[in-house]
């Protein structure tokens, strides 16, 4: 019949379930590699040579190492503040880790939403407003818990504890906004949003956190 002829004529091939699963696995592997700052590879781990593993990792590691020098520059620029209140140094790792974790959570959520079609680039204002409100709640919770720890367990003076906790709130807010912003920008520029994942977000957030920390310390502690 004419309908059968049309069906036969339009049929150009068959995609099996195995082919579909293989494609999904390849896409997932590529995204995981990008989200961990590695070049993607279509080969299984044990079938990649040492040279291939090196090529997939070294360029990103070099880029992130160079990027992290900005954090060192910030610390050197505020050596006077650290010298005046040396206890500030002890809380730098906690602040940068909190910022990196908050930014990574936001980025992962946005990237997944974009992957399943739940989020579009034109949703950016709504994304930022939503992330801002969530960040206030998360940052406030962390700051309250941390303030109690600093006062009652660490024996830190209230002014220094206030500096650390205010920085913590600001860091979480900035980190989640950055984490929500970068994947959308990447999508608009036709880059893979997965590139804007944990390692890159952490590098950006580290520098931002240090700038906020030392400036709040200078204002509140008069140093």
Task: Label the model's feature ranges.
Residues 77-92, 154-166, 194, 223:
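Membrane-water interface of transmembrane alpha-helices in multipass transporters/channels
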Residues 63-68, 91, 95, 99, ...:
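Alpha-helical transmembrane segments in multi-pass membrane proteins
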Residues 77-81, 150-157, 182-189, 214-223:
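Transmembrane helix-loop junctions at the membrane interface of multipass transporters and ion channels
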Residues 2-92:
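Cytosolic regulatory modules rich in charged/polar residues
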Residues 55-60, 125-138, 201:
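Alpha-helical transmembrane segments of multi-pass membrane proteins
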Residues 19-53, 104-128, 184-190:
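Non-transmembrane, extramembrane segments of multi-pass ion/lipid transporters
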Residues 90-93, 104-115, 183-187, 198-199, ...:
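Re-entrant/interfacial helical elements at transmembrane boundaries that shape
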Residues 82-87, 174-184, 194-195, 213:
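Nucleotide-binding motor/catalytic cores of P-loop/tubulin-like NTPases across gene-expression machines
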